[in-house]
Amino acid sequence: MPTKARIRLWSTNVENLNYVITQIRGIVEKTGIEMRGPIPLPTSKLEVPIMRLPHGEGRKKWEKWEMRVHKRLIDIAADERVMRQLMRVRVPEDVYIEIQLI
């Protein structure tokens, strides 16, 4: 039977990501289970250069659009009660969660 659960979270909005992490931390502290993290993983930047003029004539002026994806990693002991409560956590639309049992 797995003894650990590795939770990976990622989002483009840091405030929503931290909100979900505080909810997970509250559940873990209530049950008294060992928790490691949140470990901040490297932020990936997606850059898209777009030419400002649609017809292509004149000076070439570029706009650069950027999207940052923030990632966190949490390791907790895999307890059945805690896993059920984690499934009930309300998660905003722009936060993605992946749970892996180790």
Swiss-Prot record:
The keyword Ribonucleoprotein applies. One of its GO terms (cellular component) is cytosolic small ribosomal subunit. GO terms for biological process: translation. Keywords: Ribonucleoprotein, Ribosomal protein. SUPFAM superfamilies: Ribosomal protein S10 (SSF54999). GO terms for molecular function: structural constituent of ribosome; tRNA binding. Pfam families: Ribosomal_S10. Involved in the binding of tRNA to the ribosomes. Belongs to the universal ribosomal protein uS10 family. Part of the 30S ribosomal subunit. PANTHER family: 30S RIBOSOMAL PROTEIN S10 FAMILY MEMBER. This is Small ribosomal subunit protein uS10. It comes from Saccharolobus solfataricus (strain ATCC 35092 / DSM 1617 / JCM 11322 / P2) (Sulfolobus solfataricus). The gene is rps10.
